[in-house]
C-alpha cells in the first residue's frame, strides 16, 4: 500500500493543480475579484486540514492531511493568475511531491519495524535507528519549508503573490504556516524522541531505504540551488 500512497501524494494529487492551471488559462485575468470566494475557501480549507493534522494519531493520516493543506495554498495562488503566483504554485507542487513521498516512505520504514502507525507507540526510534532519525529530521524541515529548500521558495512566492492581491490573506497564510510547523515538529518528536516501547530486536535500516531517501531529497536540494529549471 505504501507505493500507492507515495504515487498518490507525489503525482496524482498534483494533477489536480495542473488541471486548474490549464483551466484558468481560458478565464479572464482581470476579473480575479469574482474568484474571491474560491480563494477564501482554499485558504480556509488549508487551515482546517492543518488543524486536522494536529489531532491525528495515525502517522499516514497525518502525512495525507498535510498534502491536502499544501494543495490549498497552491489552488489559492493559481486562481489569482499572476506570474509569481504560478511560479510559486509550480515550485511548491514539485517540492511537496518529493517531500510527501519521502515522508510516506519513512512512515513505511517505521511501520515495518514497529507494526503500528500510532504515533505514541513509535516513539524513541532515535536510539534504535539513528540514521532514519536524520532522514526524518530533513524531511520534516522540508515540510516546514525552511530556507534554502524549494518548499521555502514556493511558499515565499505564494505569500508574495497573495499579499499583493489582498494584504488580509497574510493572516490566513501565517496561521497555516504556523500550524504546519507545529504538527511537523510534533510528528518528529512523537516518532523519534522519548523512551521506546519496543521490547523485541529491531532490524537496522537497509541500504535500499537510504538510497530511496537519497533519491527523494538530493533532487530537491539540487532544484533548490537552481530553481530556474522549473520556475
Curated annotation (Swiss-Prot):
Q: What Pfam families does UniProt report for this protein, alphabetically? A: Proton_antipo_M (PF00361)
The main location class comes to mitochondrion
The record's annotation in InterPro entries points to: NADH_UbQ_OxRdtase (IPR003918), ND/Mrp_TM (IPR001750)
Single GO cellular component term: mitochondrial membrane
* Membrane topology per record: Multi-pass membrane protein
Gene Ontology MF term list:
NADH dehydrogenase (ubiquinone) activity; ubiquinone binding
What transmembrane ranges does the database entry give? Answer: 1-21, 34-54, 63-85, 89-111, 128-148, 169-189
Enumerate the subcellular locations listed in this protein's record, separating them with semicolons: Mitochondrion membrane
Question: What keywords sit in the KW lines?
Answer: Electron transport, Membrane, Mitochondrion, NAD, Respiratory chain, Translocase, Transmembrane, Transmembrane helix, Transport, Ubiquinone
Q: Does the keyword Transmembrane apply?
A: yes
Please state the Enzyme Commission number of this protein: 7.1.1.2
Q: Which cysteines are joined by disulfide bonds?
A: none
Question: What catalytic activity is recorded?
Answer: a ubiquinone + NADH + 5 H(+)(in) = a ubiquinol + NAD(+) + 4 H(+)(out)
Please verify whether the record's keywords include Electron transport. yes
Tell me the GO BP annotations in alphabetical order: ATP synthesis coupled electron transport; electron transport coupled proton transport
Its biological function? Answer: Core subunit of the mitochondrial membrane respiratory chain NADH dehydrogenase (Complex I) that is believed to belong to the minimal assembly required for catalysis. Complex I functions in the transfer of electrons from NADH to the respiratory chain. The immediate electron acceptor for the enzyme is believed to be ubiquinone.
Q: Name the family.
A: Belongs to the complex I subunit 4 family.
Q: Mind telling me what this protein is named?
A: NADH-ubiquinone oxidoreductase chain 4
Which gene holds the coding sequence for this protein? MT-ND4
Amino acid at each position: 500500500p505504501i507505493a500507492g500512497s507515495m504515487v498518490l501524494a507525489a503525482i496524482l494529487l498534483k494533477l489536480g493543480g495542473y488541471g486548474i492551471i490549464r483551466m484558468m488559462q481560458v478565464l479572464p485575468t482581470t476579473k480575479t475579484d469574482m474568484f474571491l470566494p474560491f480563494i477564501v475557501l482554499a485558504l480556509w480549507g488549508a487551515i482546517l486540514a492543518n488543524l486536522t493534522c494536529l489531532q491525528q494519531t495515525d502517522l499516514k493520516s497525518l502525512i495525507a492531511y498535510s498534502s491536502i493543506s499544501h494543495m490549498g495554498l497552491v489552488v489559492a495562488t493559481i486562481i489569482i493568475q499572476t506570474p509569481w503566483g504560478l511560479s510559486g504554485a509550480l515550485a511548491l507542487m514539485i517540492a511537496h511531491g518529493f517531500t510527501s513521498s519521502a515522508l510516506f516512505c519513512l512512515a513505511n520504514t517505521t511501520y515495518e519495524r514497529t507494526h503500528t502507525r500510532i504515533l505514541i507507540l513509535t516513539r524513541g526510534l532515535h536510539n534504535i535507528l539513528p540514521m532514519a532519525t536524520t532522514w526524518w529530521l530533513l524531511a520534516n524541515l522540508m515540510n516546514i519549508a525552511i530556507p534554502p529548500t524549494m518548499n521555502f521558495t514556493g511558499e515565499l512566492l505564494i505569500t508574495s503573490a497573495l499579499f499583493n492581491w489582498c494584504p488580509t490573506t497574510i493572516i490566513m497564510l501565517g496561521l497555516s504556516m504556523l500550524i504546519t510547523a507545529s504538527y511537523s515538529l510534533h510528528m518528529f518528536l512523537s516518532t523519534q524522541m522519548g523512551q521506546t516501547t519496543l521490547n523485541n530486536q529491531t532490524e537496522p535500516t537497509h541500504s535500499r531505504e537510504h538510497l530511496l531517501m537519497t533519491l527523494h531529497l538530493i533532487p530537491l536540494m539540487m532544484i533548490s540551488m537552481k530553481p530556474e529549471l522549473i520556475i
